[in-house]
A protein has these predicted regions:
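Structural marker of alpha-solenoid helical repeat scaffolds
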Residues: 41, 74-76, 109-110, 143-144, ...
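Register position in tetratricopeptide repeats
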Residues: 24, 58, 92-93, 126, ...
Protein backbone atom coordinates (compact mmCIF):
# COMPACT_ATOMS: atom_id res chain seq x y z
CA UNK A 1 0.00 0.00 0.00
CA UNK A 2 2.68 2.49 1.00
CA UNK A 3 4.83 1.73 -2.04
CA UNK A 4 1.98 1.69 -4.62
CA UNK A 5 -0.11 4.51 -3.12
CA UNK A 6 -3.17 2.25 -3.21
CA UNK A 7 -5.35 3.10 -0.23
CA UNK A 8 -6.87 0.40 1.98
CA UNK A 9 -8.65 0.71 5.30
CA UNK A 10 -6.77 -0.47 8.38
CA UNK A 11 -7.99 -0.39 11.92
CA UNK A 12 -6.07 1.74 14.39
CA UNK A 13 -4.09 -1.11 15.95
CA UNK A 14 -2.86 -2.25 12.54
CA UNK A 15 -1.65 1.25 11.70
CA UNK A 16 0.21 1.49 15.00
CA UNK A 17 1.90 -1.87 14.42
CA UNK A 18 2.92 -0.88 10.88
CA UNK A 19 4.34 2.48 12.00
CA UNK A 20 6.24 1.01 14.96
CA UNK A 21 7.64 -1.70 12.69
CA UNK A 22 8.96 0.87 10.22
CA UNK A 23 10.43 2.98 13.05
CA UNK A 24 12.15 -0.07 14.53
CA UNK A 25 13.81 -1.00 11.22
CA UNK A 26 14.81 2.60 10.50
CA UNK A 27 12.50 3.23 7.53
CA UNK A 28 11.25 6.60 8.73
CA UNK A 29 9.97 7.82 5.37
CA UNK A 30 7.58 4.86 5.21
CA UNK A 31 6.65 5.40 8.86
CA UNK A 32 5.77 9.03 8.07
CA UNK A 33 3.64 7.94 5.12
CA UNK A 34 1.86 5.43 7.32
CA UNK A 35 1.22 8.12 9.97
CA UNK A 36 -0.25 10.41 7.31
CA UNK A 37 -2.57 7.70 5.99
CA UNK A 38 -3.46 6.63 9.49
CA UNK A 39 -4.45 10.14 10.56
CA UNK A 40 -6.54 10.52 7.43
CA UNK A 41 -8.51 7.43 8.46
CA UNK A 42 -8.34 7.99 12.24
CA UNK A 43 -7.94 11.77 12.69
CA UNK A 44 -8.73 11.71 16.41
CA UNK A 45 -6.18 9.04 17.37
CA UNK A 46 -3.90 10.29 20.13
CA UNK A 47 -1.55 7.33 19.69
CA UNK A 48 -1.01 8.14 16.01
CA UNK A 49 -0.38 11.79 16.86
CA UNK A 50 2.19 10.73 19.45
CA UNK A 51 3.92 8.58 16.83
CA UNK A 52 3.89 11.59 14.51
CA UNK A 53 5.56 13.63 17.27
CA UNK A 54 8.14 10.89 17.81
CA UNK A 55 9.08 11.04 14.12
CA UNK A 56 9.34 14.85 14.27
CA UNK A 57 11.70 14.57 17.23
CA UNK A 58 13.78 11.99 15.39
CA UNK A 59 14.13 14.38 12.43
CA UNK A 60 15.00 17.20 14.85
CA UNK A 61 11.85 19.15 13.93
CA UNK A 62 11.49 20.23 17.53
CA UNK A 63 9.34 23.33 16.96
CA UNK A 64 6.73 21.30 15.09
CA UNK A 65 6.97 18.52 17.68
CA UNK A 66 6.27 21.00 20.50
CA UNK A 67 3.30 22.45 18.63
CA UNK A 68 1.75 19.03 18.04
CA UNK A 69 2.49 17.98 21.62
CA UNK A 70 0.69 21.01 23.00
CA UNK A 71 -2.41 20.02 21.02
CA UNK A 72 -2.23 16.45 22.34
CA UNK A 73 -1.71 17.58 25.94
CA UNK A 74 -4.88 19.68 25.80
CA UNK A 75 -6.82 16.57 24.79
CA UNK A 76 -5.08 14.14 27.18
CA UNK A 77 -3.24 16.01 29.96
CA UNK A 78 -2.61 12.80 31.92
CA UNK A 79 -1.12 10.72 29.13
CA UNK A 80 2.32 9.50 30.24
CA UNK A 81 3.55 9.49 26.62
CA UNK A 82 3.02 13.25 26.47
CA UNK A 83 5.54 13.76 29.26
CA UNK A 84 7.94 11.19 27.80
CA UNK A 85 7.96 13.08 24.50
CA UNK A 86 8.34 16.39 26.36
CA UNK A 87 11.37 14.90 28.11
CA UNK A 88 12.83 13.70 24.81
CA UNK A 89 12.47 17.16 23.26
CA UNK A 90 14.04 19.12 26.12
CA UNK A 91 16.77 16.49 26.44
CA UNK A 92 17.68 17.13 22.80
CA UNK A 93 17.91 20.81 23.73
CA UNK A 94 20.35 19.94 26.52
CA UNK A 95 17.83 20.64 29.29
CA UNK A 96 18.37 17.41 31.17
CA UNK A 97 17.00 18.56 34.53
CA UNK A 98 13.76 19.58 32.83
CA UNK A 99 13.71 16.22 31.07
CA UNK A 100 14.00 14.49 34.45
CA UNK A 101 11.07 16.51 35.82
CA UNK A 102 8.90 15.40 32.91
CA UNK A 103 9.92 11.76 33.28
CA UNK A 104 9.17 11.80 37.01
CA UNK A 105 5.71 13.16 36.13
CA UNK A 106 5.30 10.36 33.56
CA UNK A 107 6.12 7.79 36.27
CA UNK A 108 3.08 8.88 38.24
CA UNK A 109 0.80 8.31 35.25
CA UNK A 110 1.64 4.73 34.29
CA UNK A 111 2.14 1.27 35.74
CA UNK A 112 4.62 0.41 32.96
CA UNK A 113 7.63 2.09 34.52
CA UNK A 114 10.64 0.17 33.17
CA UNK A 115 11.17 2.25 30.03
CA UNK A 116 10.83 5.48 32.02
CA UNK A 117 13.39 4.32 34.59
CA UNK A 118 15.77 3.62 31.71
CA UNK A 119 15.22 7.10 30.29
CA UNK A 120 15.70 8.63 33.75
CA UNK A 121 18.93 6.72 34.17
CA UNK A 122 20.23 8.07 30.86
CA UNK A 123 19.28 11.65 31.75
CA UNK A 124 21.10 11.40 35.07
CA UNK A 125 24.13 10.04 33.19
CA UNK A 126 24.10 13.16 31.02
CA UNK A 127 24.42 15.14 34.27
CA UNK A 128 27.16 12.84 35.62
CA UNK A 129 24.81 12.09 38.51
CA UNK A 130 25.88 8.48 38.73
CA UNK A 131 24.14 7.70 42.01
CA UNK A 132 20.65 8.62 40.77
CA UNK A 133 21.36 7.02 37.40
CA UNK A 134 22.37 3.81 39.17
CA UNK A 135 19.24 3.78 41.34
CA UNK A 136 17.01 4.02 38.27
CA UNK A 137 18.88 1.28 36.42
CA UNK A 138 18.60 -0.89 39.55
CA UNK A 139 14.83 -0.39 39.39
CA UNK A 140 14.95 -1.75 35.84
CA UNK A 141 16.95 -4.80 36.92
CA UNK A 142 14.60 -5.46 39.84
CA UNK A 143 11.66 -5.33 37.44
CA UNK A 144 13.32 -7.58 34.86
CA UNK A 145 16.18 -9.73 36.12
CA UNK A 146 17.27 -10.41 32.53
CA UNK A 147 17.58 -6.72 31.61
CA UNK A 148 21.32 -7.05 30.97
CA UNK A 149 21.61 -3.61 29.39
CA UNK A 150 20.49 -2.04 32.66
CA UNK A 151 22.74 -4.42 34.60
CA UNK A 152 25.73 -3.18 32.61
CA UNK A 153 24.65 0.40 33.29
CA UNK A 154 24.42 -0.25 37.04
CA UNK A 155 27.99 -1.57 37.06
CA UNK A 156 29.14 1.33 34.88
CA UNK A 157 27.76 3.77 37.46
CA UNK A 158 29.53 1.93 40.28
CA UNK A 159 32.74 2.13 38.22
CA UNK A 160 32.38 5.87 37.69
CA UNK A 161 31.76 6.32 41.42
CA UNK A 162 34.79 4.09 42.12
CA UNK A 163 32.56 2.00 44.40
CA UNK A 164 33.95 -1.37 43.42
CA UNK A 165 33.18 -3.20 46.67
CA UNK A 166 29.61 -1.89 46.53
CA UNK A 167 29.41 -3.21 42.96
CA UNK A 168 30.56 -6.62 44.18
CA UNK A 169 27.94 -6.60 46.94
CA UNK A 170 25.22 -5.70 44.43
CA UNK A 171 26.31 -8.36 41.95
CA UNK A 172 26.50 -11.04 44.64
CA UNK A 173 22.86 -10.31 45.56
CA UNK A 174 21.95 -10.39 41.89
CA UNK A 175 23.72 -13.75 41.43
CA UNK A 176 21.79 -15.16 44.40
CA UNK A 177 18.64 -14.52 42.33
CA UNK A 178 20.10 -15.42 38.93
CA UNK A 179 23.05 -17.79 39.58
CA UNK A 180 23.47 -18.92 35.97
CA UNK A 181 23.97 -15.44 34.52
CA UNK A 182 27.37 -15.37 32.81
CA UNK A 183 27.10 -11.59 32.42
CA UNK A 184 26.92 -11.09 36.19
CA UNK A 185 29.85 -13.45 36.86
CA UNK A 186 31.87 -11.63 34.21
CA UNK A 187 31.07 -8.24 35.73
CA UNK A 188 31.87 -9.31 39.29
CA UNK A 189 35.17 -10.68 37.99
CA UNK A 190 35.95 -7.28 36.49
CA UNK A 191 35.36 -5.63 39.86
CA UNK A 192 37.69 -8.08 41.59
CA UNK A 193 40.28 -7.39 38.88
CA UNK A 194 40.10 -3.64 39.49
CA UNK A 195 40.75 -4.32 43.19
CA UNK A 196 43.69 -6.61 42.27
CA UNK A 197 41.91 -9.55 43.89
CA UNK A 198 42.98 -11.76 41.02
CA UNK A 199 42.24 -15.16 42.55
CA UNK A 200 38.62 -14.18 43.21
CA UNK A 201 38.40 -12.65 39.74
CA UNK A 202 39.67 -15.89 38.22
CA UNK A 203 36.98 -17.90 40.01
CA UNK A 204 34.31 -15.53 38.71
CA UNK A 205 35.54 -15.82 35.12
CA UNK A 206 35.65 -19.60 35.49
CA UNK A 207 31.96 -19.58 36.40
CA UNK A 208 31.19 -17.30 33.45
CA UNK A 209 32.78 -19.62 30.87
CA UNK A 210 31.35 -22.75 32.52
CA UNK A 211 27.86 -21.26 32.15
CA UNK A 212 28.53 -20.19 28.56
CA UNK A 213 31.37 -22.06 26.87
CA UNK A 214 31.23 -19.63 23.93
CA UNK A 215 31.57 -16.48 26.07
CA UNK A 216 34.52 -14.72 24.44
CA UNK A 217 34.59 -11.88 26.99
CA UNK A 218 34.88 -14.39 29.83
CA UNK A 219 37.86 -16.15 28.28
CA UNK A 220 39.52 -12.83 27.49
CA UNK A 221 39.25 -11.54 31.05
CA UNK A 222 40.30 -14.93 32.39
CA UNK A 223 43.42 -14.80 30.21
CA UNK A 224 44.27 -11.28 31.40
CA UNK A 225 43.85 -12.40 35.02
CA UNK A 226 46.06 -15.47 34.54
CA UNK A 227 48.64 -13.16 33.01
CA UNK A 228 48.46 -10.90 36.08
CA UNK A 229 49.01 -14.00 38.25
CA UNK A 230 52.08 -14.98 36.23
CA UNK A 231 50.42 -18.09 34.78
CA UNK A 232 51.56 -17.20 31.28
CA UNK A 233 51.02 -20.55 29.54
CA UNK A 234 47.47 -20.81 30.87
CA UNK A 235 46.89 -17.23 29.79
CA UNK A 236 48.08 -18.10 26.29
CA UNK A 237 45.70 -21.08 26.18
CA UNK A 238 42.74 -18.84 27.02
CA UNK A 239 43.73 -16.14 24.55
CA UNK A 240 43.88 -18.87 21.89
CA UNK A 241 40.34 -19.93 22.79
CA UNK A 242 39.14 -16.38 22.06
CA UNK A 243 40.75 -16.64 18.62
CA UNK A 244 38.89 -19.89 17.97
CA UNK A 245 35.54 -18.47 19.06
CA UNK A 246 35.72 -15.09 17.38
CA UNK A 247 37.55 -13.18 14.68
CA UNK A 248 41.26 -12.70 15.28
CA UNK A 249 42.22 -9.47 17.04
CA UNK A 250 45.51 -7.66 17.22
CA UNK A 251 44.95 -7.26 20.97
CA UNK A 252 44.90 -11.03 21.54
CA UNK A 253 47.99 -11.55 19.38
CA UNK A 254 49.88 -8.86 21.32
CA UNK A 255 48.91 -10.37 24.66
CA UNK A 256 50.02 -13.83 23.52
CA UNK A 257 53.30 -12.33 22.35
CA UNK A 258 53.88 -10.69 25.72
CA UNK A 259 53.15 -13.95 27.52
CA UNK A 260 55.66 -15.80 25.37
CA UNK A 261 58.19 -13.06 26.04
CA UNK A 262 57.65 -13.52 29.78
CA UNK A 263 58.25 -17.25 29.29
CA UNK A 264 61.54 -16.47 27.54
CA UNK A 265 60.34 -17.71 24.16
CA UNK A 266 61.43 -14.78 22.00
CA UNK A 267 60.80 -16.59 18.70
CA UNK A 268 57.14 -17.26 19.57
CA UNK A 269 56.76 -13.71 20.87
CA UNK A 270 58.04 -12.29 17.58
CA UNK A 271 55.68 -14.57 15.64
CA UNK A 272 52.63 -13.28 17.49
CA UNK A 273 53.73 -9.64 17.43
CA UNK A 274 54.04 -9.97 13.65
CA UNK A 275 50.56 -11.51 13.53
CA UNK A 276 49.31 -8.50 15.51
CA UNK A 277 50.70 -5.92 13.09
CA UNK A 278 49.52 -8.00 10.14
CA UNK A 279 46.01 -7.98 11.61
CA UNK A 280 46.22 -4.25 12.37
CA UNK A 281 49.09 -2.49 10.54
CA UNK A 282 48.21 0.77 12.32
CA UNK A 283 48.78 -0.72 15.78
CA UNK A 284 51.79 1.36 16.80
CA UNK A 285 52.19 -0.57 20.05
CA UNK A 286 52.63 -3.80 18.07
CA UNK A 287 55.55 -2.30 16.16
CA UNK A 288 56.99 -1.04 19.46
CA UNK A 289 56.90 -4.54 20.97
CA UNK A 290 58.82 -5.84 17.96
CA UNK A 291 61.27 -2.98 18.40
CA UNK A 292 61.84 -3.81 22.05
CA UNK A 293 62.39 -7.51 21.52
CA UNK A 294 64.97 -6.91 18.79
CA UNK A 295 66.60 -4.22 20.95
CA UNK A 296 66.93 -6.74 23.78
CA UNK A 297 68.53 -9.15 21.30
CA UNK A 298 70.98 -6.38 20.31
CA UNK A 299 69.69 -6.52 16.73
CA UNK A 300 69.66 -2.74 16.47
CA UNK A 301 69.17 -2.56 12.70
CA UNK A 302 65.86 -4.43 12.93
CA UNK A 303 64.92 -2.46 16.02
CA UNK A 304 65.51 0.75 14.05
CA UNK A 305 63.29 -0.51 11.23
CA UNK A 306 60.40 -1.34 13.55
CA UNK A 307 60.59 1.86 15.61
CA UNK A 308 60.38 3.83 12.38
CA UNK A 309 57.17 1.92 11.64
CA UNK A 310 55.76 2.85 15.05
CA UNK A 311 56.69 6.51 14.60
CA UNK A 312 55.15 6.65 11.14
CA UNK A 313 51.85 5.76 12.82
CA UNK A 314 52.19 7.81 16.01
CA UNK A 315 54.92 10.43 16.27
CA UNK A 316 53.36 12.11 19.30
CA UNK A 317 54.39 9.48 21.85
CA UNK A 318 57.56 10.44 23.70
CA UNK A 319 58.16 6.81 24.67
CA UNK A 320 58.65 5.92 21.00
CA UNK A 321 61.11 8.77 20.50
CA UNK A 322 63.07 7.74 23.57
CA UNK A 323 63.44 4.22 22.21
CA UNK A 324 64.31 5.68 18.80
CA UNK A 325 67.18 7.65 20.36
CA UNK A 326 68.43 4.69 22.37
CA UNK A 327 68.62 2.65 19.17
CA UNK A 328 70.37 5.42 17.25
CA UNK A 329 72.95 5.70 20.02
CA UNK A 330 73.70 1.99 19.71
CA UNK A 331 74.20 2.50 15.97
CA UNK A 332 76.38 5.59 16.56
CA UNK A 333 73.91 7.83 14.71
CA UNK A 334 74.38 10.69 17.13
CA UNK A 335 72.56 13.46 15.26
CA UNK A 336 69.46 11.28 14.97
CA UNK A 337 69.72 10.40 18.66
CA UNK A 338 69.82 14.11 19.49
CA UNK A 339 66.73 14.69 17.35
CA UNK A 340 64.87 11.94 19.20
CA UNK A 341 65.67 13.24 22.67
CA UNK A 342 64.73 16.77 21.60
CA UNK A 343 61.39 15.41 20.40
CA UNK A 344 60.86 13.80 23.82
CA UNK A 345 61.31 17.17 25.49
CA UNK A 346 59.06 18.95 23.00
CA UNK A 347 56.35 16.36 23.74
CA UNK A 348 56.54 17.06 27.46
CA UNK A 349 58.73 14.15 28.56
CA UNK A 350 60.93 15.98 31.05
CA UNK A 351 62.22 12.93 32.87
CA UNK A 352 65.72 13.58 34.17
CA UNK A 353 67.02 10.61 32.18
CA UNK A 354 65.96 12.28 28.93
CA UNK A 355 67.76 15.50 29.85
CA UNK A 356 70.89 13.63 30.91
CA UNK A 357 70.96 11.45 27.80
CA UNK A 358 70.63 14.49 25.54
CA UNK A 359 73.34 16.38 27.43
CA UNK A 360 75.70 13.40 27.19
CA UNK A 361 75.22 13.03 23.43
CA UNK A 362 75.70 16.76 22.85
CA UNK A 363 78.82 16.66 25.00
CA UNK A 364 80.16 13.65 23.09
CA UNK A 365 79.80 15.45 19.74
CA UNK A 366 81.40 18.61 21.14
CA UNK A 367 78.26 20.75 21.36
CA UNK A 368 79.18 22.06 24.81
CA UNK A 369 77.08 25.25 24.76
CA UNK A 370 74.01 23.36 23.57
CA UNK A 371 74.58 20.79 26.33
CA UNK A 372 74.84 23.60 28.87
CA UNK A 373 71.53 25.08 27.69
CA UNK A 374 69.82 21.72 28.17
CA UNK A 375 71.25 21.41 31.68
CA UNK A 376 69.88 24.83 32.57
CA UNK A 377 66.41 23.68 31.44
CA UNK A 378 66.81 20.44 33.36
CA UNK A 379 67.74 22.25 36.55
CA UNK A 380 64.42 24.12 36.59
CA UNK A 381 62.51 20.94 37.24
CA UNK A 382 65.22 18.85 38.88
CA UNK A 383 66.97 20.81 41.60
CA UNK A 384 69.80 19.38 43.69
CA UNK A 385 70.52 16.41 41.45
CA UNK A 386 74.13 15.23 41.46
CA UNK A 387 73.71 14.03 37.86
CA UNK A 388 73.11 17.62 36.78
CA UNK A 389 75.67 19.35 39.00
CA UNK A 390 78.64 17.15 37.99
CA UNK A 391 77.82 17.74 34.33
CA UNK A 392 77.62 21.48 34.97
CA UNK A 393 81.06 21.27 36.54
CA UNK A 394 82.54 19.36 33.62
CA UNK A 395 81.04 21.58 30.93
CA UNK A 396 82.00 24.85 32.61
CA UNK A 397 85.54 23.53 32.97
CA UNK A 398 85.69 22.62 29.29
CA UNK A 399 84.40 26.09 28.41
CA UNK A 400 87.22 27.66 30.48
CA UNK A 401 84.84 28.89 33.15
CA UNK A 402 86.59 27.19 36.04
CA UNK A 403 85.03 29.43 38.68
CA UNK A 404 81.53 28.18 37.80
CA UNK A 405 82.91 24.69 37.38
CA UNK A 406 84.31 24.68 40.91
CA UNK A 407 81.04 26.04 42.36
CA UNK A 408 79.04 23.25 40.75
CA UNK A 409 81.61 20.61 41.67
CA UNK A 410 81.40 21.58 45.33
CA UNK A 411 77.59 21.54 45.15
CA UNK A 412 77.66 18.14 43.45
CA UNK A 413 79.98 16.65 46.08
CA UNK A 414 77.67 17.89 48.83
CA UNK A 415 74.77 16.08 47.18
CA UNK A 416 76.54 12.79 46.38
CA UNK A 417 80.32 12.56 46.64
CA UNK A 418 80.58 9.00 45.30
CA UNK A 419 78.89 9.97 42.04
CA UNK A 420 81.98 12.03 41.11
CA UNK A 421 83.10 8.99 39.11
CA UNK A 422 80.88 10.33 36.32
CA UNK A 423 83.52 12.99 35.72
CA UNK A 424 86.02 10.25 34.89
CA UNK A 425 83.59 8.70 32.40
CA UNK A 426 82.42 11.87 30.66
CA UNK A 427 85.06 14.52 31.34
CA UNK A 428 88.32 12.64 31.81
CA UNK A 429 90.48 15.72 31.19
CA UNK A 430 88.58 17.55 33.91
CA UNK A 431 88.69 14.59 36.29
CA UNK A 432 92.46 14.17 36.04
CA UNK A 433 93.06 17.90 36.29
CA UNK A 434 95.26 18.65 39.28
CA UNK A 435 92.81 21.23 40.66
CA UNK A 436 89.90 18.82 40.41
CA UNK A 437 91.82 16.06 42.15
CA UNK A 438 92.73 18.42 44.97
CA UNK A 439 89.09 19.49 45.40
CA UNK A 440 87.95 15.87 45.52
CA UNK A 441 90.69 14.92 47.97
CA UNK A 442 90.15 17.90 50.26
CA UNK A 443 86.39 17.34 50.34
CA UNK A 444 86.81 13.68 51.24
CA UNK A 445 89.21 14.49 54.08
CA UNK A 446 86.91 17.20 55.40
CA UNK A 447 83.94 14.85 55.55
CA UNK A 448 85.67 11.81 57.03
Amino acid sequence: MLKTNNVYFFDLTEFEEIIIHYIDIGKHSLAKKAVKLGLEQHPDSIDLKLLQIELCVFENKLVLAKKLLTQVEILEPNNDEVFIQKATIVSKEGKHKEAIENLIKALTLTDDKEDIWTLLGMEYLYLDDFENARLNFINCVNADIEDYSSLYNVVYCFDMEEKHQEAIDFLNKYIDKNPYCEVAWHQIGRQYSVLKRHEEALSAYDFAVIIDELFVGGYLEKAKTLEALGAYQEAIDNYLITLELDDATAFAFVRIGECYQQLGNAAAAILYYKKAVHEDPLLAKGWLYLTNIYFDQKNYEKAAYYISKALSIDDSDALYWRRYSEIKLKLNFFEEAIKGFEMCLSLGDEDINVFIALVDVLTFVGEFNAALSILIKAQKGHKNFAEIEYRFAGLFWLLNKQKFGIEHLIKAMNIDYDYHIILKELFSSVYFNEGTQKLLSDFKKATE
